[in-house]
UniProtKB/Swiss-Prot annotation:
WD repeats lie at residues 183-223, 228-267. Gene3D superfamilies: YVTN repeat-like/Quinoprotein amine dehydrogenase (2.130.10.10). Its main location: other. The keyword Repeat applies. The L/FRRG motif is required for recruitment to PtdIns3P. This is WD repeat domain phosphoinositide-interacting protein 3. Pfam families: PROPPIN. One of its GO terms (biological process) is cellular response to starvation. It is found in: Preautophagosomal structure; Lysosome. The lineage of its organism: Eukaryota, Metazoa, Chordata, Craniata, Vertebrata. It comes from Xenopus tropicalis (Western clawed frog). A motif (L/FRRG motif) lies at residues 224-227. GO terms for molecular function: phosphatidylinositol-3,5-bisphosphate binding; phosphatidylinositol-3-phosphate binding. GO terms for cellular component: lysosome; phagophore assembly site.
C-alpha cells in the first residue's frame, strides 16, 4: 500500500506491505522503517533516520535483508535507487541506480526484481548485482509485479504490453514463451500469486470483478464479483493453501471468497435463469467485513484458521474471525504505530 505523495492521516506512514508469507509486515515512514509480526501483532524492528523518509520497503521472508526506496517529504535515498539494507549490520550493503524512479522492488533469495514505470529489470541477488533480464510493460505507475517466492517455482508476473493483459515468465527458463493472459478489458489495478505460484488473481481499475487464472495454462478458473459499483482495489491475497482469497478496496470493506470451491460463494437465486444478464449468475464473497475507519488498507489471512488481518493507513490493525457461514466478528484492534519494540 503506497501512500505517497502524502498520507491524509498525517502519521508519517508512507508505505505498508506484507512479506512473502504474510507472517510480517513492513512500514516505510517519514523517518525510517518498521517491521512487525503480523499475528500476533508485535513490533520487531524500528529503524529511525534523523532525516529521511522511506517510501517503499520489501522484506525477504524474515531474513536480515530488506529493499528500501526513498520517499516522502525528505527522502532518505534518491527515488531512482534501490538500497539493500542489512539489518544485522544496520547499513546498506547493495545499491542499484536507475535513470527513472523506482516503483517497486520484489525479492527472492536469488533475485532482485526492480519495477520501473514501463519496464522490469531482474538482477542476481549478489554483492555486485548482475542484470539478467529486462521485460517491457505497459505504463505501470503502480509498480504492479508479483514474484513467486517458492524455491521450486521462479514465476514473475506483471502487466503485459497490452492493456489489461498479464504476462507470466519463468525466470528459470526464459527461453520458454511467456504466458499471456487477457485478464481484463481495462487497466490492471492489482495482481496476486499464491505461495506455490500455480494461481494468479487479477483486478482492473473498475474493481468489480476478481478473476483467478491457472499460471501454467492461462485458463480462467473463477470469476468473482466484489460488487456492482466501481472500486479501487488496494490488495488481493491468497491464504496458504490457495483455497481462499481476501480483497480490500476503497469502499472500506474486506471481502473473502472461496477460490477453489465455488459453491461456498454466494449466488443469486436467479443464477440459473438463462435469460437474465451475466450479473445474476455472479459469485459473490461468502464473508465480508467493514474496516471501521474506512481507511485504505491491505489485508492477509492470519495464522489462525478463518482469520483475516487488515493493516490500515491510519495506523490501525484489525483481526477479524469468520466462520464457514460467513459470519464475521472483530477479534483484535490495535494502533500499530504506537507500539513499543518487542524483540522476543
Amino acid at each position: 500500500m503506497n501512500l505517497l505523495p502524502s498520507n491524509p492521516h498525517g502519521n508519517g506512514l508512507l508505505y505498508a506491505g506484507f512479506n512473502q508469507d504474510h507472517g510480517c509486515f513492513a512500514c516505510g515512514m517519514e523517518n525510517g522503517f518498521r517491521v512487525y509480526n503480523t499475528d500476533p501483532l508485535k513490533e520487531k524492528e524500528k529503524q529511525e533516520f534523523l532525516e529521511g523518509g522511506v517510501g517503499y520497503v520489501e522484506m525477504l521472508f524474515r531474513c536480515n535483508y530488506l529493499a528500501l526506496v526513498g520517499g516522502g517529504k525528505k527522502p532518505k535515498y534518491p527515488p531512482n535507487k534501490v538500497m539493500i539494507w542489512d539489518d544485522l549490520k544496520k547499513k546498506t550493503v547493495i545499491e542499484i541506480e536507475f535513470s527513472t524512479e523506482v516503483k517497486a522492488v520484489k525479492l527472492r533469495r536469488d533475485r532482485i526484481v526492480v519495477v520501473l514505470d514501463s519496464m522490469i529489470k531482474v538482477f542476481t541477488f549478489t554483492h555486485n548485482p548482475h542484470q539478467l533480464h529486462v521485460f517491457e510493460t505497459c505504463y505501470n505507475p503502480k509498480g504492479l509485479c508479483v514474484l513467486c517466492p517458492n524455491s521450486n517455482n521462479s514465476l514473475l508476473a506483471f502487466p503485459g504490453a497490452h492493456t489489461g493483459h498479464v504476462q507470466i515468465v519463468d525466470l528459470a527458463s526464459t527461453e520458454k514463451p511467456p504466458v499471456d493472459i487477457p485478464a481484463h478489458e481495462g487497466i490492471l489495478s492489482c495482481i496476486a500469486l499464491n505461495l506455490q505460484g500455480t494461481r494468479i488473481a487479477t483486478a482492473s481499475e473498475k474493481g468489480t470483478l476478481i478473476r483467478i487464472f491457472d499460471t501454467s495454462s492461462g485458463h480462467l478458473i473463477q470469476e468473482l464479483r466484489r460488487g456492482s459499483q466501481a472500486a479501487n482495489i488496494y490488495c488481493i491475497n491468497f491464504n496458504e493453501d490457495a483455497s481462499l482469497i481476501c480483497v480490500s478496496s476503497d469502499h472500506g470493506t474486506v471481502h473473502i471468497f472461496a477460490a477453489e470451491d465455488p459453491k461456498r460463494n454466494k449466488q443469486s437465486s436467479l443464477a440459473s435463469a438463462s435469460f437474465l444478464p451475466k450479473y445474476f449468475s455472479s459469485k459473490w464473497s461468502f464473508s465480508k467485513f467493514q474496516v471501521p475507519s474506512g481507511s485504505p488498507c491491505v489485508c492477509a489471512f492470519g495464522t489462525e484458521p478463518n482469520s483475516v488481518i487488515a493493516i490500515c493507513a491510519d495506523g490501525s490493525y484489525y483481526k477479524f474471525q469468520f466462520n464457514p457461514k460467513g459470519e464475521c466478528t472483530r477479534d483484535v484492534y490495535a494502533q500499530f504505530l504506537e507500539m513499543t519494540d518487542d524483540k522476543l
